[in-house]
Amino acid sequence: MKLILLVGGPRGGLDLFQSLLDNHDEILQFPGIIHINEKLIKILSHKSKEKIAQNFTKEYLSFFDSRKSIIERHYMLGDKKKQFYKVNTKDFIERFILLSKKNYLFKDKLFQNLFLLHMAYNSINNSKKKKLLVINAHSIPYALNFEKLFKGVNYEIIHTIRHPLSAVSSTLKNWLKFKNGVHLKPKELYYNLESIVLGIQKLNKLKKKVYIIQLENLHQKLNLVMLHLCKIYNLKFKKCLRKSTY
C-alpha cells in the first residue's frame, strides 16, 4: 500500500480533489484534514488501544457526524445541500481494537496506529483491498511536521495549486469577506502569498516525489487528471473519480 500526503497550495482546490477520491474502493482516507502535530502524536502514543480510538473520535468529531464540521461543507451534501453523514463511534472503537490485534503493516508504531484508525473507519462501510492510503495534511507546515514525527515512513506528495493570479485574487476576496480578519489573519495572508511563490520549492526539500495538480485542470481536464492518477498508482478508473461528494 502506498501512502500519499495531500498538500494544498493557497486556494488550490485541495478539498475538491479529495472529495473526488471519496468513493473509490481502492483508496483509504478520512473525509477531511488530519492535523499532523504533537496533539495527534499524543493520541497515537497512548498504551490503551481503546483510549487511542476514543480520543481520536473526540478530536475529530466531524468525521463521525459531519454536522459538526465548521470549515468543510460536509453538512451541506446532496443536491439540496441538506444531507450529512454519521459513523457509529462504538463500532469504530471496537473495530480498531480488533484490527490492532492482528494487523502489522508499518514498522513505526505510531503510524501503524494511524493506519489502523483509517482501516477501522473504512471497514465499517467497505472492506475491499486498498492500494492507496491518502492523508489530507492540508498545508506545507503539516507536511513538514509529518517528516519530523514519522521518520522512516515512506510517502509521496500530491500538491494542488492554482494559477498564481487567480490564487492571489481568491485569497484576497476570501479575506475581505470576514470582518477584522476573523477567518484569515494578516500573517495567514502573508503565508498564502509566500506559498504561491515558494510552496513547491519547500516541498521539494523533503526529497519525496511531488505530483502537481492545478485546479484549473481539475475543472477543464478532469478525465485526463484522474486517468493519470490511476496510471501512476495502478488504480481502476471509475466514474466516481469524476464526481465530487459535495
Give the predicted meaning of each segment.
Residues 1-3:
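Pre-Walker A (Motif I) flank of P-loop NTPase domains
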Residues 6:
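Hydrophobic anchor at the beta1->P-loop junction of P-loop NTPases
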Residues 9:
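P-loop (Walker A) phosphate-binding loop of NTP-binding proteins
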Residues 14-27:
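A conserved segment at the C-terminal end of the G1
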Residues 27-34, 211:
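Conserved catalytic segments around the Walker B and adjacent sensor/switch elements
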Residues 31-37, 163, 243:
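Conserved beta-strand -> loop -> alpha-helix junction used to position metal-binding or nucleic-acid-contacting
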Residues 33-135:
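PAPS-dependent sulfation machinery
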Residues 120-242:
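PAPS-dependent sulfotransferase catalytic domain
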